[in-house]
């Protein structure tokens, strides 16, 4: 199965990315405060096919942020709304004059336009920054995780930046996501999972009894009731995927499996909209495409970037898989349409062997039956069953027999033995009925006397 790939150099370190349609995605990053010559920017890129059946990446538009501000650290987008996390310059933050670290842009398909910004954290420490930004599917809510101490997460209305709830998480938030229906927000620390209601702001389910030998890294809702978590071993190589049900206010582990023993850490994860592929970025700058159907690594792209991978994203139609890096590069993979459901060589070989074994076993059974004349026994058995079924048609039917002495009613039983018994009973009934008939006739018609007896009586 052939994959087409393209490596594209943007020109500045990248820290956030999101598809805005099937073939366009926005990236953000920059050199940060004091890094002269490397801008802080947002850029919209378009991916498509080029001549020779390859891939091409083109720049659609960009927007440059103030040069003295910090570099953007997080991004999410829904529809035409783009939110980024980006601190203002450190002098302003320290002065207490505010830090508009959440900024909103609009994309109309041709250009990016800055719309507004707000200070959610109210921090005067320039080291505090926005770690994660997530928008709900309909764009009506946003969740923002901060690095400040104590660690916290805020749920806001992105239209006016009003804070609905602020939650102290206790430990650094590794990742967070909204459920598809937007009623829940889930986040993980390195050792716990917590699900919060976006309606009440209270915790609805929590899991803290994970194996102490693993470190939770990334998470995403598979649907409204199930969460996928990616984790690694704390002291050895290995990547694990775990599916957890949160239905009915309790957590249930559906499955947990190690999918690779070659990598030490995970830097990014995404699940496609069809929920059949998972993309993972590893600590050695490789990208894994994992099939959820059987939890197998379908394809590994080794060391596609020269520096840390900061984000991986699927296109809405699952045609493209994109990874971005602090090495200023974008790597695009075009995924074959049948890849998620395809079988590997080992799977195909195993299936062929199983089918062959089943055919040989069936042939052996049929041959043994033929040698032992079992087919004749089976045929005779079904014939006997058919014969019994045919005789049963007479079961419980009433029969009438007309004789010289009257009508006799008999009941025929459903088996031959009972039928013979019934005939005997009927014969007895005939004799009894005959005797009764003769007696009745003698009473009704007296016996005629001889002439001699008649004369004697007259005398």
UniProtKB/Swiss-Prot annotation:
Compositionally biased spans, kind Low complexity: 422-435
Question: GO CC: one term?
Answer: endoplasmic reticulum membrane
Q: Which GO terms describe its molecular function?
A: GTPase activator activity; guanyl-nucleotide exchange factor activity
* Subcellular locations according to the entry: Endoplasmic reticulum membrane; Golgi apparatus, cis-Golgi network membrane
Listed Basic and acidic residues bias regions: 436-452
Lumenal topological domain ranges are 371-459
The annotated region (Disordered) lies at 417-459
Q: Does the keyword rRNA processing apply?
A: no
Q: Which residues form a coiled coil?
A: none
> Where are its TM segments located?
352-370
Topology relative to the membrane = Single-pass type II membrane protein
Q: Which residues lie on this side of the membrane: Cytoplasmic?
A: 1-351
Record-level GO BP terms: endoplasmic reticulum to Golgi vesicle-mediated transport; protein transport; regulation of COPII vesicle coating
Q: Which ranges does the UniProt record give for the WD repeats?
A: 256-291, 294-334
Q: Which UniProt keywords apply?
A: Endoplasmic reticulum, ER-Golgi transport, Glycoprotein, Golgi apparatus, GTPase activation, Membrane, Protein transport, Repeat, Signal-anchor, Transmembrane, Transmembrane helix, Transport, WD repeat
Residues carrying a glycan: 435
Per the record, the similarity remark reads:
Belongs to the WD repeat SEC12 family.
What does this chain do?
Guanine nucleotide-exchange factor (GEF) required for the formation or budding of transport vesicles from the ER. This function involves the cytoplasmic domain of the protein, which is thought to interact with the small GTP-binding protein SAR1. Required for autophagy.
- The name of this protein is Guanine nucleotide-exchange factor SEC12
The record lists the lineage as: Eukaryota, Fungi, Dikarya, Ascomycota, Saccharomycotina
Give the gene that encodes this protein.
SEC12
